[in-house]
Amino acid sequence: MARRRVQRLSEEEQDLMQFEDRYKNRPRPKQESTDLVAGIVIRARGHHYDVQTDPGTDNRVRVCEVRGRLLAEQIADRSKDTLVAVGDHVWVRPNGKEKGLIERIDERTSVLSRQRPGVNVLAEDVILANPDQALVVFAAADPEPHTRMLDRFLVIAEFNELPTVICVNKIDLTGRAAAEAIFGQYERIGYEVIYASAERGEGIEQLRELLIDRITVVTGPSGVGKSSLINHLDQRLHLQVGDLRDFLHKGKHTTRAAQLFPLPFGEKTYIADTPGIRELGLYDIDPIDLQFYFVEMQEYRHDCHYSGCTHDHEPDCAVRAAVERGDIDRERYESYLRLLHGEE
């Protein structure tokens, strides 16, 4: 029966069977996934990337290059300005004990990006891939806090849909009440604010819970005590003042590179100090859309007389009326106007 059924096959089906018989006994190449190990890019150095592989692999950090095919795809698509960024989840083909080749890059779930410093054209420079949140550290005093710098970063974070927590360090210098007088406005519009003192250990437990098993962008002006705060998170850390920036090899905001710094609690807890906070650009935000990233304006902007109201000079503006009533903080509104007019 079987033989007669074979005889009734079409010539095309017979050719297919012969092809399968010819090649079915040949050794098959291994599936790509069996040769690859998963990891996260913790540092970028030119065309080389330090990849920390997942627990259980032979080598936790490998120096990797990118597969030529991926580079060719980037050249063909000029819109892909940053092929591999710190924070990217990648798949690496090991090469020896310490090296590897990046074969695949997982899709990013979030990014923190900016205009390339010194470049006037629109170009996306991904500072960090897949961040979970941002921690903006300011000091209550020494140095004096400049909230317009904070407002500018909050716009960038809102645009990137990046949850942000504000940490106010050095409250031992002013007292909590004085710090709240400056930063309480951010609590009132929905931001979480942690009042801390590295000197007295206040607010440390809140910070630890905030960071566990997350990739956190840590940023803020120089001298606000970022390293001192991190020292208090775990007794195994012994960073001196400035050591965090030295560890990240960034000097004083002189490079665009970032690096993930693993913390010794949780399974995948990383912090990343972002370089060049003063160079963060609002390059991809149309001025008319800036209002969407000042969260306190949202409940008022729909009540403006003109649908395209910029909340600057137009009559019957509900946002300006809210400022006059004190419902919107005047300093925040002034920050909005400065950004609206490009006075960064």
Label every PLM stretch briefly.
Residues 97-106, 144-145:
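Short, Lys/Arg- and Gly-enriched loop/turn segments at beta-strand edges
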Residues 39-41, 102:
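Conserved hydrophobic positions within beta-strands
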Residues 148-158:
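Histidine-anchored nucleotide/phosphate-binding helix
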Residues 227:
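Walker A/P-loop
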Residues 1-7, 17, 32-35, 47, ...:
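Helix-rich effector regions associated with P-loop NTPase G domains
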Residues 173-224:
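Canonical P-loop GTPase G-domain recognition
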Residues 131-138, 160-169, 190-196:
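Conserved beta-strand/loop subsegment of P-loop NTPase cores
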